[in-house]
A protein has these predicted regions:
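A short core secondary-structure module
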Residues: 207-252
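Internal helix-loop-helix
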Residues: 80-171, 218-220
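Glycine-rich beta->alpha junctions and the first turn(s) of the following alpha-helix
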Residues: 130, 251-257
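Extended, charge-enriched "interface" segments that sit outside catalytic cores
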Residues: 1-110
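Buried hydrophobic positions in well-ordered alpha/beta secondary-structure cores of metabolic enzymes
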Residues: 141, 182, 200, 210-212, ...
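Short beta-turn/strand-loop junction motif enriched in small, turn-promoting residues
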Residues: 185-189, 214-216, 257
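Internal maturation/activation junctions in enzymes
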Residues: 149-198, 203-206
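Short, solvent-exposed loop/turn segments at the edges of secondary structure
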Residues: 136, 177, 193-195, 220-222, ...
Length: 257
């Protein structure tokens, strides 16, 4: 007895082993029109790699194996670490290798680099979307940090501008690559960040101690976060590293993912 009830038709086949760039006429035309045609060869290479069955499988694995919050180690020591499936790390390696997080901020950047970066972003987005969050925040934070990074963290600029992904828990200056997250929103302060209650107290050495909470603390495994807090003169933005300059963990507590 057959259990077949119908025949599947009028459905596209699996998207396997296609070039995500060369098959996108609109993207190729826009790239040239907006002044980034010089990146076409590299984008074709990226599109070929991302369109493979193996690459698309990485996206599936990263989404079906969500990150895990590890609050404590076996001895009861507080960690607040986030563990990811290996597929996540491989996807992040590709994004950083293709400089989706910092291409326009290079000293010798070319005209049209924002367009080229956007095209690379679009190709990666077709494989997996979650990894684009840390990449986008790092991209947005980099020009600010290039101008205003505290003196004791200036050595971070080299790994910040690298094409490497480094998931190790190390002081920023010792890493091959960095990620920057953001902590803006609070329970009572969503779009109205002026209502944030996190406070910043200036210490004798010129640094600040932040006390408060964040409703969203995006990419908690980042090497540092830009955090909004109320200082003496009003709302301001602070650079908060995951590890302090002496290598100790900062007092950041993650409640849930």
């Amino acid at each position: 007895m057959s259990w077949q009830t119908h025949t599947v038709f009028n459905q596209p086949g699996p998207l396997n082993n296609s070039n995500l760039f060369l098959s996108d006429g609109a993207l190729r035309e826009a790239l040239v029109r907006e002044g980034a045609g010089w990146d076409s060869d590299l984008l074709a290479s990226i599109g070929q790699q991302l369109g493979t069955a193996e690459s698309l499988e990485l996206g599936r694995l990263a989404n079906t194996n969500p990150p895990e919050l590890l609050r404590y180690d076996a001895t009861g020591t507080r960690l607040d670490d986030v563990r990811f499936h290996p597929a996540w790390h491989l996807l992040m390696q590709g994004l950083c290798a293709n400089r989706v997080h910092n291409l326009p901020w290079e000293e010798d950047t070319r005209a049209g680099s924002f367009v080229a970066r956007a095209a690379r972003f679009m190709l990666h987005a077709q494989v997996e979307a979650g990894t684009l969050c840390p990449i986008t925040m790092t991209f947005a934070a980099t020009p600010l940090l290039q101008q205003a990074l505290p003196a004791e963290f200036k050595e971070w600029l080299t790994p910040l501008m690298s094409d490497r992904y480094d998931s190790h828990l190390l002081p920023g200056a010792q890493k091959r690559g960095l990620l920057i997250g953001m902590g803006m929103t609070e329970k009572q302060g969503g779009s109205d960040v002026l209502s944030n209650t996190t406070r910043a107290e200036r210490l004798a050495d010129g640094s600040y101690r932040l006390v408060g909470h964040k409703w969203f603390f995006s990419v908690p495994q980042s090497d540092a976060h830009l955090v909004l807090a109320q200082a003496k003169g009003g709302l301001s933005c602070f650079f908060m590293p995951r590890l302090l300059p002496d290598g100790q963990r900062n007092a950041i507590r993650i409640e849930r993912l």
